[in-house]
């Protein structure tokens, strides 16, 4: 057997007849499967033990030899070799076909490989192969054309005319095989290359296609005649099993039926040939044999599929590979695993960040082997069998052992759908009673989990290495930041936010205001005994908190704060400033001086002079967590988060906030606002009836009126709200709900969407406090159903987008430290019109500079070339007034098959420089795909006034960008750099003409009359600039400008869509994806290289091909960059395993086989498929070839490991 972890590459080619014979262990001559009386396989049948091996381990068919000691002996009675039964999964047989048969993949695929090789049309081929026409093979001295078709009648006439034997014409696959044998590859290729020099149009395209196929045969060493089969391999019987069902009936794989048909027809054909049967009967049998083999290889590809019982099409060999249920996606890319469990999740508020609760019964089953080993080691049982009995009986002693076993053994928890890598995290198990898994409340956001019946799967990492990786790399406490934007993903939510919000509220005149305490304990004592309220403003001695970073002027003073804030600050990391105001200045620069009493000052005076601060909201807590992480990294942050969670839950319980109908306020002037809107709508309808506006205009005006009415109510609601109202507190803190929910409770529900996406004109005037009328309720449910269906469709769409993204970028891995490129990317803030969608500061964080950045006024060097830009540095650059910076970018990285560390920058999930081996492609794909469900589905209908196009937004726009489709509402772009000299309107054709004067000439562009212009006369425009509003077609932009412009444009467009929906994604993720779309070039002129014109190839391969030619002084090849959508890019990857497992499996494999493609196993998918460890992370060669050293020889590196000790 090949050692799967040793081989370097994998090749696929056509199998020659001799190769098939060398695989085979014998010929299958009979269509029988098993004897239904004895249930033994029939001799020479499809399950024959002589050919395929014994059905029982170490036992021949007749039973003469049993036991392992006869290993390798071939029984003299039954001829079966004594060996393991599993050889029945490996040994193949064969069928000697009595007539050649064409392979349907090569004849029927698009383009037909057989047709291109022979220069015949697929129609002609079909007529010949299925015995409808003769083809002239050798005209000899007759005037017939080679490869011309003759009908039966014409053939007989020609025979009479020229005499028997004067020419050779045949029909069937045999004829095709003869023609294929006659193809002289070298001569044909030379001839086509000559033809290409002069050909153009259709002729050229066809020549390029033929040249491609012939060249593939020539280079791969495959012979064209192997596309026709003379011998058919039979796959091992255990891969097409036959199992007995309870009722004594049998269930067999469809393949057995298909093989039986082939054998039956083959045997019948052999008999007919022996009997010298009439030609027409033999021909018919040959055609049936051809059809039987077609059905076996790819049933349904030609004609009607062969059906089984209940007219179900049989599953052929091709179907075994294709689709979600095929071999690739079902068994190779994802397998079911042992040592796993699944249960409902419940909340575990008492757990630490790195813990999860595992039910006892589940744990004992999952850790059974470990427990059994310990039982034997402790000599509670003599052997493993007895230990197993002990566990199954539920002996008392096993529970103590289980506690020991799981102590340092992390488990993985996974929630489907796993949209990003935070969907699987490691935890230390804690045994609990009950049957539900307990999950820490803070990791819910990463999993997108809630406790309304969600289920999660649990897995046990078995090997030492797996446990170490789970503990060091996957522990939940390590995953504080979200890989997509580097912001904390573990922000408290709901009750935790509400508790901390309530705790940090301030209130004037509450009991205990103005009291001064010597330390925290005294303040808490006063609060517990009812002398001071949580919200009352009191004084505390600064010296009681010596570890806080006070300014010198603040020490030894009294500080004004609240009892709640004393408690709140008590859980903060010691080195963080005392948080008195919910803003970043307090967090980064320290507590403001105004809260400190000067000696002899009256505390009440100071209190009266201070404004009441707003409490800490969800966003503030997020900022505190981010700052904590930045300063103290993982261990301290996760411990702090647990303290924050406990404090939040505790005080949320004490606060006892509830919601009753009385908490929903009544808006005093609601009737006035609604009457005014009714009045306005009536006026609009009057104007419409008089013909003063179109129906579209009227619709927009009416909906706008109602929208404004709703906004007016909302505004009034905010003005009159009571900050102590529980609903307002929930909304304001960010714990639950937003102003829109609140205004539906207290204002009006507003306009609803109809199922077709159009907004209905009749609004719902009531709110939920008043209750809805029957008609309003109907409209309301109408809109709600639309929402539900949208969500369901969106989820599927978004999932498919993620799959395509992962597929195209799965082989992008950080391969080296620095690629040494001298190119960079000039970046500035991304704007949409006047609006800034992404600031320069955000874009600079965590990137390396390409050139040094200077202060625009003083000329001082702010940061040198090739330096990492930190958050503080980015702020400094922007504050200095710099508007554009040249940075290292994934777009310009010169690393092959991946990216280098400097071009990528920091890893957003850790905040540190990215490590070599990080699978950045997959992370990028997940970061873009995961928020896909949050994007809207709709294409906005602007009511036909503002523009003549529908603006595509949300998910459809993202798909449009990544698939490089022509956008809806395309903008007209200029190909000339110069000035707009004239815009003339032509009423007759309803168009405008824009004239751009450049140095080389005048550009004239026709624009639709209704399009909104982006330029005016006198404006200076660059090549590729949009003249009208709308999206630019990226392929056009690539023709006019260069690759980098297209990449920059696509990056900006993706960011616009996500940022407009409030989703932040790091630029680098989009860069990785966009770069994959522009990896290929098309060869235009091959020069002196041996490339073929029109070939699509990787940029790096093209450069290599040119390098040698340039060195030897030849003419290099020229090429043009090609922009491909992600689906096409995935299929065009260099790895045929990855492409075949993605889509269009048969086409990919057909093509790969003809070319004799080699897969060098560089990506992740290929390695998962063949079962090798993936070449990313710790699976990279550089991390695997490790020499162990004694501990005392090297210094022990202190890793920020979070474990039970962190308590």
From Swiss-Prot:
Domain of life, source organism: Bacteria
Pfam family, one: RNA_pol_Rpb1_2
Cofactors demanded by this protein: Mg(2+); Zn(2+)
Amino acids binding Zn(2+) 2: 819, 893, 900, 903
GO terms, biological process: DNA-templated transcription
Catalytic activity annotation: RNA(n) + a ribonucleoside 5'-triphosphate = RNA(n+1) + diphosphate
Molecular function GO terms recorded: DNA binding; DNA-directed RNA polymerase activity; magnesium ion binding; zinc ion binding
Family: Belongs to the RNA polymerase beta' chain family.
Function noted in UniProt: DNA-dependent RNA polymerase catalyzes the transcription of DNA into RNA using the four ribonucleoside triphosphates as substrates.
HAMAP family: RNApol_bact_RpoC
Protein name: DNA-directed RNA polymerase subunit beta'
Organism annotation: Streptococcus pyogenes serotype M3 (strain ATCC BAA-595 / MGAS315)
Taxonomic classification: Bacteria, Bacillati, Bacillota, Bacilli, Lactobacillales
Underlying gene: rpoC
């Amino acid at each position: 057997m090949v050692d799967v972890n040793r081989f370097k590459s994998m090749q696929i080619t056509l199998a020659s007849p001799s190769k098939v014979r060398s695989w085979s262990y014998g010929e299958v001559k009979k269509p029988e499967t098993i004897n239904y009386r004895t249930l033994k396989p029939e001799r020479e049948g499809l399950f024959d033990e002589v050919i395929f091996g014994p059905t029982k381990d170490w036992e021949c068919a007749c039973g003469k030899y049993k036991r392992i000691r006869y290993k390798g002996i071939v029984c003299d009675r039954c001829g079966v070799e004594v060996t393991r039964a599993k050889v029945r999964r490996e040994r193949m047989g064969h069928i000697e076909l009595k007539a050649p048969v064409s392979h349907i993949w090569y004849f029927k695929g698009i383009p037909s490989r057989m047709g291109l090789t022979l220069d015949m049309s697929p129609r002609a081929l079909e007529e010949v192969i299925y015995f409808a026409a003769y083809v002239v093979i050798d005209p000899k001295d007759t005037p017939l054309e080679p490869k011309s078709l003759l009908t039966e009648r014409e053939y007989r006439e020609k025979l009479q005319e020229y005499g028997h034997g004067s020419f050779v014409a045949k029909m069937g696959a045999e004829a095709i095989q003869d023609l294929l044998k006659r193809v002289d590859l070298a001569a044909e290729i030379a001839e086509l290359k000559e033809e290409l020099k002069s050909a153009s149009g259709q002729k050229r395209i066809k020549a390029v296609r033929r040249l491609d196929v012939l060249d593939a045969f020539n280079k791969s060493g495959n012979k064209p005649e192997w596309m026709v089969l003379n011998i058919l391999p039979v796959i091992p019987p255990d891969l097409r099993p036959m199992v007995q069902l309870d009722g004594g009936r049998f269930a067999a794989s469809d393949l057995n039926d298909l093989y039986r048909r082939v054998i039956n027809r083959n045997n019948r054909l052999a008999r007919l040939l022996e009997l010298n049967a009439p030609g027409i009967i033999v021909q018919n049998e040959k055609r049936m044999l051809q059809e039987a083999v077609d059905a076996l290889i790819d049933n349904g590809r030609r004609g009607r599929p062969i059906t089984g019982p209940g007219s179900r099409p049989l599953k052929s060999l091709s179907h075994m590979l294709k689709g979600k249920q095929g071999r690739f996606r079902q068994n190779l890319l994802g397998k079911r695993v042992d040592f796993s469990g699944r249960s409902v999740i419940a909340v575990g508020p008492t757990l630490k960040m790195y813990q999860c609760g595992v039910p006892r019964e589940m744990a004992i089953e999952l850790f059974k082997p470990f427990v059994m080993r310990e039982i034997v080691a402790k000599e509670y049982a003599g052997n493993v069998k007895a230990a197993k009995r002990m566990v199954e009986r539920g002996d008392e002693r096993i529970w103590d052992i289980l506690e020991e076993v799981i102590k340092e053994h992390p488990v993985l928890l996974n929630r489907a759908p796993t949209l990003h890598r935070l969907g699987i995290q490691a935890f230390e198990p804690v045994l609990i009673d009950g049957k539900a898994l307990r999950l820490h409340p803070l990791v819910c956001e990463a999993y997108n989990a809630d406790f309304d019946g969600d289920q999660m799967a649990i897995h046990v990492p078995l090997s030492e290495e797996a446990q170490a990786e789970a503990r060091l790399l996957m522990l939940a406490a390590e995953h504080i930041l979200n890989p997509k934007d580097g912001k904390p993903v573990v922000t408290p939510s709901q009750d935790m936010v509400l508790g901390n919000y309530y705790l940090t509220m301030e209130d004037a005149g509450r009991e205990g205001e103005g009291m001064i305490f010597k330390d925290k304990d005294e303040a808490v004592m006063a609060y517990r005994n009812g002398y001071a309220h949580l919200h009352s403003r009191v004084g505390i001695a600064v010296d009681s908190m010596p570890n806080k970073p006070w300014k010198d002027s603040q020490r030894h003073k009294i500080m004004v704060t609240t009892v709640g804030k004393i408690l709140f600050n008590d859980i903060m990391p010691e080195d963080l400033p005392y948080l008195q105001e919910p803003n970043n200045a307090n967090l980064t620069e320290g507590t403001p001086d105004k809260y400190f009493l000067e000696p002899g000052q009256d505390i009440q005076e100071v209190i009266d002079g201070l404004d009441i601060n707003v409490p800490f909201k969800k966003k503030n807590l997020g900022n505190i967590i981010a700052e904590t992480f930045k300063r103290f990294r993982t261990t301290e942050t996760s411990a702090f988060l647990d303290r924050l969670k406990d404090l939040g839950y505790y005080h949320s319980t004490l606060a006892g906030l509830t919601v009753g109908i009385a908490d929903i306020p009544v808006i005093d002037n609601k009737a006035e606002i609604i009457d005014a809107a009714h009045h306005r709508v009536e006026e609009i309808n009057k104007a419409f009836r008089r013909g003063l506006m179109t129906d579209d205009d009227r619709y927009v005006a009416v909906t706008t009126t109602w929208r404004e009415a709703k906004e007016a109510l909302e505004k009034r609601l905010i003005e009159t709200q009571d900050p102590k109202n529980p609903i307002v507190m929930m909304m304001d803190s960010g714990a639950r709900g937003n102003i829109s929910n609140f205004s539906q409770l207290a204002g009006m529900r507003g306009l609803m969407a109809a199922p077709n996406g159009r907004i209905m004109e009749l609004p719902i005037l009531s709110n939920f406090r008043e209750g809805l009328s029957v008609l309003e309720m109907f409209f309301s449910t109408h809109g709600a159903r639309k929402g539900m269906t949208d969500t369901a469709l969106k989820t599927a769409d978004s999932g498919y987008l993620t799959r395509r993204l992962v597929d195209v970028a799965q082989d992008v891995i950080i391969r080296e430290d620095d690629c040494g490129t001298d190119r960079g990317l000039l970046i500035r803030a991304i704007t949409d019109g006047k609006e800034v969608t992404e600031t320069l500061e955000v874009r600079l964080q965590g990137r390396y500079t390409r050139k040094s950045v200077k202060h625009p006024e003083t000329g001082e060097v702010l940061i040198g070339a090739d330096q990492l830009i930190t958050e503080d540095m980015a702020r400094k650059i922007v504050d200095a007034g710099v508007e554009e910076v040249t940075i290292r970018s994934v777009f310009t990285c010169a690393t092959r098959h991946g990216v280098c560390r400097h071009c990528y920058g920091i890893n957003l999930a850790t905040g540190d420089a990215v490590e070599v081996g990080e699978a950045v492609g997959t992370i990028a794909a997940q970061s873009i795909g995961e928020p896909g469900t949050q994007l809207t589905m709709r294409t906005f209908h602007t009511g036909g006034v503002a523009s003549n196009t529908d603006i595509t937004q949300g998910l459809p726009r993202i798909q449009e960008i990544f698939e490089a489709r022509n956008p809806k509402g395309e903008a007209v772009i200029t190909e000339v750099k110069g000035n707009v000299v004239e815009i003339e309107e032509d009423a007759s054709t309803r168009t405008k003409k824009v004239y751009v004067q450049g140095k080389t000439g005048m550009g004239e562009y026709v624009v639709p009359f209704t399009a909104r212009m982006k330029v005016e006369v006198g404006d200076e425009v660059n090549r590729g600039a949009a003249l009208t509003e709308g999206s630019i077609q990226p392929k056009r932009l690539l023709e006019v400008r260069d690759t980098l412009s297209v990449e920059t444009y696509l990056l900006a467009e993706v960011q616009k869509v996500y940022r407009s929906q409030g989703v932040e994604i790091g630029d680098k993720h989009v860069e990785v994806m966009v770069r994959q779309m522009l990896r290929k070039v098309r060869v235009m002129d091959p020069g002196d290289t041996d490339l073929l014109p029109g070939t699509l190839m990787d940029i790096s391969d093209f450069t290599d091909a040119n390098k040698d030619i340039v060195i030897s002084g030849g003419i290099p090849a020229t090429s043009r960059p090609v922009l491909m959508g992600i689906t096409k890019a995935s299929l065009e990857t260099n790895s045929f395993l990855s492409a075949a497992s993605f889509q269009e499996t048969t086409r990919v494999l057909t093509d790969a086989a003809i070319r004799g493609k080699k897969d060098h196993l560089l990506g992740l998918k290929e390695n998962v498929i063949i079962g090798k460890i993936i070449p990313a992370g710790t699976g990279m060669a550089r991390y695997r070839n490790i020499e162990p050293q004694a501990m005392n020889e090297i210094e022990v590196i202190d890793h920020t490991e979070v474990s039970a000790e962190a308590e």
